[in-house]
């Protein structure tokens, strides 16, 4: 069965475009829970007005995410990727459903007790995020760049769709009794269904696509053990291939060597997410003041970020816009930090139009640079090395997000009633 795929060129295999669609949906599922939480932020500010929900929940999320990805990155070669990803999607599905149960149990009332439970649920989001994002990017690093680009684009699609649905539900229920709560609950219910769909797709559809079988079989022949369960799920039971001795298996670069060869990539990803998460979502909810859009203002800003992040992740498909020069990527990443004073002075002196423009630039550059790095970095490595590098790249994304969340609290310095 494996030999059938080993002698075929990837472009001649069926299922590439189906795989791209499935990868996009799986990308949506890996971030829709977190984006749902951000998008109903206006509701949580109504229920927990004294607890800085957007800042605190983001800060709670990150340690669980980082702790999990550190463990997975260190042990990636020994971990069953199929179980890892399935557990992640199942935890996502369960956790977002628990948000609905929590709200129904408390009847939408706040207090420190429900807030602590909310924080615990958000912690499980962090575990699931590290499990799925690291597992999927590591797995897709074994395959063609189009698949990892589709998955990463799906992360942005999650943000764009959740923002759009949130604006629709807010508009639909704004003038009804308890409308904000009803809109948030319907929104979370839709997100739960999306997560459940991802469980089914990853378990029963994705592993059976011919192009996915091809790349996983190729990775197994190069010594990758993480794909064995997925190959078995696809009906490839040739044990002589799955357990064959290969001299190259013992020659793979270790994590330290991979980091040294890709230090600019990991540092750039770290800096991209330090900047992004220092502004999103806390600054946009708490530091942008009152404008003509009223309670819609923060939601519109989040939506603009998400939509332009999505656009940025598809820009590399245009060849002359795909930045592959490593020095060029570093210059672009460092230039983004000019947005910090721009946001500060716009929040203080500018109007909502300028803020929307800055948020759009933040999203566009975040998506574009992320895809350029994730698609370029794994090239030239063996299957096991690609999987390891994929996990390391996600580790630095999440570490950057954590540092960014921490730095985001600095925006509260000098603000009245900040704490």
UniProtKB/Swiss-Prot annotation:
<dbReference type="GO" id="GO:0005886">
    <property type="term" value="C:plasma membrane"/>
</dbReference>
<keyword id="KW-0813">Transport</keyword>
<feature type="transmembrane region" description="Helical">
    <location>
        <begin position="86"/>
        <end position="106"/>
    </location>
</feature>
<comment type="similarity">
    <text>Belongs to the SLC29A/ENT transporter (TC 2.A.57) family.</text>
</comment>
<dbReference type="Pfam" id="PF01733">
    <property type="entry name" value="Nucleoside_tran"/>
</dbReference>
<comment type="function">
    <text>May be involved in nucleoside transport.</text>
</comment>
<dbReference type="GO" id="GO:0005337">
    <property type="term" value="F:nucleoside transmembrane transporter activity"/>
</dbReference>
<keyword id="KW-1133">Transmembrane helix</keyword>
<feature type="transmembrane region" description="Helical">
    <location>
        <begin position="354"/>
        <end position="374"/>
    </location>
</feature>
<keyword id="KW-0812">Transmembrane</keyword>
<feature type="transmembrane region" description="Helical">
    <location>
        <begin position="393"/>
        <end position="413"/>
    </location>
</feature>
<protein>
    <recommendedName>
        <fullName>Equilibrative nucleotide transporter 5</fullName>
    </recommendedName>
</protein>
<feature type="transmembrane region" description="Helical">
    <location>
        <begin position="292"/>
        <end position="312"/>
    </location>
</feature>
<keyword id="KW-0472">Membrane</keyword>
<feature type="transmembrane region" description="Helical">
    <location>
        <begin position="327"/>
        <end position="347"/>
    </location>
</feature>
<feature type="transmembrane region" description="Helical">
    <location>
        <begin position="265"/>
        <end position="285"/>
    </location>
</feature>
<keyword id="KW-1003">Cell membrane</keyword>
<feature type="transmembrane region" description="Helical">
    <location>
        <begin position="142"/>
        <end position="162"/>
    </location>
</feature>
<dbReference type="InterPro" id="IPR002259">
    <property type="entry name" value="Eqnu_transpt"/>
</dbReference>
<feature type="transmembrane region" description="Helical">
    <location>
        <begin position="20"/>
        <end position="40"/>
    </location>
</feature>
<feature type="transmembrane region" description="Helical">
    <location>
        <begin position="186"/>
        <end position="206"/>
    </location>
</feature>
<feature type="transmembrane region" description="Helical">
    <location>
        <begin position="56"/>
        <end position="76"/>
    </location>
</feature>
<feature type="transmembrane region" description="Helical">
    <location>
        <begin position="108"/>
        <end position="128"/>
    </location>
</feature>
């Amino acid at each position: 069965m494996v030999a059938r795929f080993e002698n075929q060129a990837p472009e001649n295999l069926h299922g590439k475009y189906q795989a791209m669609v499935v990868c996009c949906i799986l990308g949506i599922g890996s971030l829709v829970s977190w984006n749902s939480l951000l998008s109903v932020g206006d509701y949580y500010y109504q229920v927990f007005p004294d607890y800085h929900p957007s800042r605190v929940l983001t800060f709670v999320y990150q340690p669980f995410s980082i702790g999990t990805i550190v463990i997975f990155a260190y042990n990636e070669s020994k971990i069953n990727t199929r179980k890892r990803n399935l557990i992640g999607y199942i935890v996502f599905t369960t956790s977002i459903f628990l948000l609905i149960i929590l709200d129904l149990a408390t009847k939408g009332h706040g207090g420190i007790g429900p807030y602590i439970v909310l924080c615990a649920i958000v912690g499980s989001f962090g575990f699931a995020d590290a499990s799925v994002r690291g597992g999927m990017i590591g797995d897709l690093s074994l395959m063609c760049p189009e698949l990892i680009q589709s998955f990463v684009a799906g992360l942005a699609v999650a943000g764009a769709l959740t923002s759009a649905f949130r604006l629709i539900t807010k508009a639909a229920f704004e003038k009804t009794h308890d409308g904000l709560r009803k809109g948030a609950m319907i929104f979370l219910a839709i997100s739960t269904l999306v997560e459940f769909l991802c469980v089914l797709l990853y378990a029963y559809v994705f592993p059976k696509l011919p192009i996915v079988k091809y790349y996983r079989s190729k990775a197994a022949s190069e010594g990758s053990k993480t794909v064995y369960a997925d190959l078995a799920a696809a009906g490839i039971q040739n044990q002589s291939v799955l357990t064959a001795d290969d001299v190259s298996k013992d020659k793979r670069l270790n994590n330290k060597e991979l980091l040294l060869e890709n230090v600019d990539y990991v540092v750039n990803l770290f800096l991209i997410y330090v900047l992004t998460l220092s502004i999103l979502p806390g600054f946009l909810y708490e530091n942008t003041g009152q404008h003509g859009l009223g309670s819609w203002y923060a939601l519109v800003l989040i939506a603009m970020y998400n939509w332009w992040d999505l656009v940025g992740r598809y820009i590399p498909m245009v060849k002359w816009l795909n930045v592959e020069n490593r020095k060029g990527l570093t210059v672009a990443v460092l230039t983004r930090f000019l947005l910090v004073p721009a946001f500060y002075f716009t929040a203080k002196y500018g109007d909502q139009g300028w803020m929307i423009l800055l948020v759009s630039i933040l999203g566009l550059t975040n998506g574009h640079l992320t895809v350029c790095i994730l698609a370029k970095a794994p090239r030239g490595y063996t299957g096991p090395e690609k999987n390891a590098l994929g996990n390391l790249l996600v580790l630095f994304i999440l570490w950057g997000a954590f540092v960014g969340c921490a730095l985001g609290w600095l925006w509260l310095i000098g603000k009245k009633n900040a704490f």
